[in-house]
Amino acid sequence: ELVIPQGKGTITLDVGEFEAFPLPDYAAKYVIDGYKSYFVEVEPGIKVHVLEVGSGFPVFLLHGNPTSGFLYRKVVEQLPTDRLRLIMPTLVGLGFSSKIPASRHTLENHMRWMNSVLVQLKLTELVYMGQDWGGPIGMGALSLSPELLKGAVLLNTGFNAPTEKADVSRVHAAVKTPIVGELMIEVFTSVFERLHRVQGDPDSIPTDVAELYGRPVLESGNSKAPLAMMRMVPDGPDHPSTAAMRIIEKYVQALDIPAEIVWGMKDPI
């Protein structure tokens, strides 16, 4: 089912007005002064929640599954907000963005929706930072507006389309099975309750941070995104995501830009 979040009032950016979204207290405590919180409606009823802070050269930071734009909150604290405009959207289905039926979670849809954010913010150039699903979705969105990308910081992610049958992890293999996946991720326990277990440092996701990511999803009544996005991960040449991954791979291979790869060596996935 489609769950449409509701904001309050408007927020004015240089490129126009957007629907403001005052953060609830449990989320507001994680952001520094000067943050903007607003929605970009990428198609009727589908709103992408955006956190933004700073002014200057745009940096587009995209998270993965099952977190949100808040993933980059500590990164932002280390960056010069007087010289950088830091834009942190949340993927549709997660955080405070709209929730959608599981069937609408496709790589092509997420690419198109995130590209719409770039277009509506009227960005003309940017540096991109991506992690997990934010890697291919972000690069896929940029492949639709290839003139924008001037540099990239790549975290734990990947852009290669699979050429043979293989699963990313044992968990990804298990959740592909209908009903089994639902029982594992949605019924027996919430994916957010286990989030600390798939970190190199489990202490990096204490209970309050798990709540930051999980509460807006669970309270929405539609928590289909985490499982749907796990099933989006291509496991072979015939997977529904593979065609889009081939486009993304080709785009990334042709890039000639400054890039930095920062990889968490204890990432268990």
What does each of the following model-derived ranges do?
Residues 46-96:
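Conserved HGGG/HGGXW glycine-rich cap/lid loop of the alpha/beta-hydrolase fold
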Residues 3, 53, 61-65, 129, ...:
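Short hydrophobic segments within beta-strands
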Residues 1-8:
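Extracellular beta-strand ligand-recognition surfaces/modules
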Residues 8-37, 48, 58, 71, ...:
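Flexible "cap/lid" subdomain of the alpha/beta-hydrolase fold that forms the substrate-access gate
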